[in-house]
Amino acid sequence: MAPRYILALDQGTTSSRAILFDRDANIVQVAQKEFTQIYPEPGWVEHSPNEIFDSQAQVLHECLRLARVSGNEIAAVGIANQRETTIVWEKSTGAPVYNAIVWQDRRTAAFCDQLRVDGKAHIIQEKTGLVLDAYFSGSKVRWILDNVPGARAKADAGELLFGTVDSWIVWNLSKRGTHVTDPSNASRTMMFNIHTGQWDSELLEIVGVPPSMLPEVVPSSSHLAEVHPEFFGRAVPVAGIAGDQQAATYGNACMSLGMAKNTYGTGCFLLLNTGHSPRASLNNMLTTVAWQTAGGYSYALEGSVFVGGAVVQWLRDGLGIIKDSSEMERLAGTVPDNGGVYMVPAFVGLGAPYWDQYARGTIVGLTRGTGRGHIARAATEAIALQTLDIIDAMQKDTGIALTALRVDGGASRNNMLMQFQADLTGVLVERPTVTETTALGVAYLAGLATGFWENEEELASLWKLDRCFSPSMPGDRRDELLYQWHRAVQRAAHWLEE
């Protein structure tokens, strides 16, 4: 039977998913499995590398079983992954030497501070497009090498491999046959030069990582590995890889200069397509590789919010004011406004445009009249307010005035949040019919490489609008919200600094 589907593996921060797409980019089947979050110390976040892959393999099989689809019907596999999360494993056995250190983890903040004192921040930003922060992979690799007994010696002897989650999944799907990554993931490690498209020896020396550990960097859309026949009954090409946010940008058909999307997931991630050359930021945005296709490199400006939808999980699991995430919109809608309450969810610091790793969460403006609804409303509004800070910074960097913002991710289904986002930004907020754009993006990349789809024009034609939210808030109300929000951010800033 001729291949009729692309299988996208979407390895996220809290769950692994497999999503089957047909030629019209419709979702045929979804399978999902959550995995364990490990918090060894305050500010530390880890995953089990084996559980990451095992959960991904399970949903791969479950998706095909539920869809009643055989391996012969799969044209290609695409892989999207949580970025920056760092895994180090033994080359000979494939055994991890330590848990995966997750992108949210802050244990290397002091090392990054020292690099800043040593004058390395400018070199790193100039070569990588990134700000010097514990968020990125390089300092996490160094921590493993310095703190796992014997790891540094093994790495120096060429016995250890490093990879972001995409590399780890490909390594295991290929039965240890292929050690690769793509430029979108490599550009998030703080070790990759986005101007030369190569690992950079000066950066590797700064973070103390041997080059022998690093994966080969291959185009995001290319025949880059073979899935071992054990998984599909035959060899199937892995033909698309991208970090989750770059994948979502591609899946939202933001393929042209000036188009932007925001993903409302665990964090919020706004990417603005800046075309075929990197654009340096003067306003604390990240310059990153968007993807590499047959047409060459595309770049983006990115603003990263560490805590977006995760604030909803905190209200559910930490405070217990909701029992299920689906209750959030209803509860926030029980009050007409935030009642003067502002929440800054800086649980692990503030991301763009502040990059304050010592900020911590605050709720300000509480009175005896404050209720659960006000807290829920303030949390909802905080997601959109953080996004607006990023949009304002990007417009200063580029001079590009957005006319629309495409959205995806779980929280994009919250109509109150989307309307509030439109009101704040003053532009149309467009939610697509298929909000699984992360998976769709790597399906597109894999499909392009294998001829499943012909070109990007065909892909753009497959994007369909579900709902458009138009701004309607009076300007004076918007100005008041922004003024009070920035006052609240000032209260949260530098909280842990002595």
From Swiss-Prot:
Q: Which terms does the UniProt entry file under GO BP?
A: glycerol catabolic process; glycerol metabolic process; glycerol-3-phosphate metabolic process
Which cellular components does GO assign to this protein?
A: cytosol
Name the EC number(s): 2.7.1.30
Q: Part of which pathway? A: Polyol metabolism; glycerol degradation via glycerol kinase pathway; sn-glycerol 3-phosphate from glycerol: step 1/1
Tell me the Gene3D superfamilies matching this sequence.
3.30.420.40
Q: Where does ATP bind?
A: 13-15, 266, 309, 313, 410
Q: Which UniProt keywords apply?
A: ATP-binding, Glycerol metabolism, Kinase, Nucleotide-binding, Transferase
Q: Does the keyword NADP apply?
A: no
Which positions in this protein are listed as binding ADP?
13, 17, 266, 309, 410, 414
Say which enzyme class the record assigns. transferase
Name the positions where glycerol binds. 83-84, 135, 244-245
Superkingdom classification of source: Bacteria
Q: Which residues bind sn-glycerol 3-phosphate?
A: 13, 83-84, 135, 244
Task: Give me the reactions it catalyses.
Answer: glycerol + ATP = sn-glycerol 3-phosphate + ADP + H(+)
Activity regulation (record text): Inhibited by fructose 1,6-bisphosphate (FBP).
Q: Which Pfam families match?
A: FGGY_C, FGGY_N
Gene Ontology MF, one:
ATP binding
Briefly state the protein's biological role.
Key enzyme in the regulation of glycerol uptake and metabolism. Catalyzes the phosphorylation of glycerol to yield sn-glycerol 3-phosphate.
Q: What family does this belong to?
A: Belongs to the FGGY kinase family.
UniProt-recorded name of the protein: Glycerol kinase
Q: Which gene produces this protein?
A: glpK
